[in-house]
């Protein structure tokens, strides 16, 4: 492998960093955006800002690669985790991303704990019921924004959305799935009981 472009989708900016096979940083492009704080509990971002950031940083990176006559072998994507974006079958976003630091889903955490002990939940998922993670946010959408939940084809994370923009495919990986509270860390598969008690389908 000669060169790899790493896309890091953070909370305040997207960074595109080009490395050679020795790990030397060859070029860095970045694009800033912001979160919307609607209250002490509600934190959202417009996913279109990530699209704009992706286009801008890829363009700058491509110009550097072309000017220096380099070959790009791979693109890797990493991101903030546990944020939730509802999208339709065509990949259109239906609501702002509910961000990882959003705390609106405390009641949904209580709903989970009413059906499964914290100990059992931790054994299955490696996580404790907390609004930080994805599934309480998904449950909040179902409870409080039902029309959006019903229209959604998928509820995905930030990294998954960027991969979709790059490839047109809806995929995730263990590093993202494990922050949803829906992945069983013992089997590395979706946990049927967590899906059932959360009501996420």
Give short role names for the model-derived ranges.
Residues 89-93, 111, 115, 120:
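Hydrophobic or amphipathic alpha-helical targeting/insertion segments
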Residues 1-95, 123, 151:
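N-terminal glycine/serine-rich phosphate-binding loop of ATP-dependent small-molecule kinases
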Residues 37-41, 107-111, 182-184:
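Short, charged, surface-exposed secondary-structure boundary motifs
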Residues 11, 121-201:
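Gly/Ser/Thr-rich active-site cleft segment
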Residues 65-99, 128-132, 163-184:
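Short beta-strand-loop/turn "lid" adjacent to the catalytic site in phosphate-handling enzymes
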Residues 102:
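Carbohydrate-associated surface elements
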Residues 63-67, 114, 143, 147:
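Secondary-structure boundary motif
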């Amino acid at each position: 492998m000669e060169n790899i472009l790493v896309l890091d989708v953070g909370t305040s900016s997207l960074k595109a960093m080009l490395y050679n096979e020795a790990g030397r940083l060859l070029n860095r492009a970045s694009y800033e955006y912001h979160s919307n704080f609607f209250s002490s509990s509600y934190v959202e971002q417009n996913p279109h800002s990530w699209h704009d950031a992706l286009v801008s940083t890829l363009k700058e990176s491509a110009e550097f690669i072309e000017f220096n006559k380099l070959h790009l072998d791979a693109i890797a994507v990493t991101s903030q985790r546990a944020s939730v974006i509802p999208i339709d079958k065509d990949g259109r976003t239906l609501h702002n991303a509910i961000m990882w630091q959003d705390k609106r889903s405390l009641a949904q955490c209580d709903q989970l704990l009413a059906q499964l002990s914290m100990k059992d939940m931790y054994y299955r998922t490696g996580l404790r019921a907390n609004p930080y993670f994805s599934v309480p946010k998904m449950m909040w959408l179902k409870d409080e924004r039902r029309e959006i939940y019903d229209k959604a084809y998928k509820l995905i994370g930030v990294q998954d959305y960027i991969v979709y923009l790059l490839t047109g495919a809806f995929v995730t990986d263990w590093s993202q799935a494990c922050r949803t509270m829906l992945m069983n860390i013992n089997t590395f598969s979706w946990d049927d009981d967590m899906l059932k008690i959360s009501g996420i389908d």
